[in-house]
UniProtKB/Swiss-Prot annotation:
It comes from the Bacteria. This is Aspartyl/glutamyl-tRNA(Asn/Gln) amidotransferase subunit C. It comes from Methylobacillus flagellatus (strain ATCC 51484 / DSM 6875 / VKM B-1610 / KT). The lineage of its organism: Bacteria, Pseudomonadati, Pseudomonadota, Betaproteobacteria, Nitrosomonadales. It catalyses: L-glutamyl-tRNA(Gln) + L-glutamine + ATP + H2O = L-glutaminyl-tRNA(Gln) + L-glutamate + ADP + phosphate + H(+); L-aspartyl-tRNA(Asn) + L-glutamine + ATP + H2O = L-asparaginyl-tRNA(Asn) + L-glutamate + ADP + phosphate + 2 H(+). Heterotrimer of A, B and C subunits. GO terms for biological process: glutaminyl-tRNAGln biosynthesis via transamidation; regulation of translational fidelity; translation. SUPFAM superfamilies: Glu-tRNAGln amidotransferase C subunit (SSF141000). The gene is gatC. Gene3D superfamilies: Glu-tRNAGln amidotransferase C subunit, N-terminal domain.
Amino acid sequence: MSLNTHDVKRIAHLARIAVSEEEAEATLVKLSGILGLIEEMQAVDTSGIVPMSHSQDVTQRLREDVVTESNQRDLLQSIAPAVENGLYLVPKVIE
């Protein structure tokens, strides 16, 4: 894929970024390098390779879910300034 400075300026315009001519030229060089690398990677035959989700094949050791805290809802609602039907009432902020 080939880009030119017009393409870089168009992308910058769509992103609402102001770029000078020098910045567009520098960005063009960087983007062309990135796109060239992508083209090289796409040219590699990966038909016999299984895709990997992570660089290391590690499984996580899972633990059982255990309740570590008791339900303190009633205690917390007893010290709240205003509660109705189990819900905390707060002052109206927006009119």
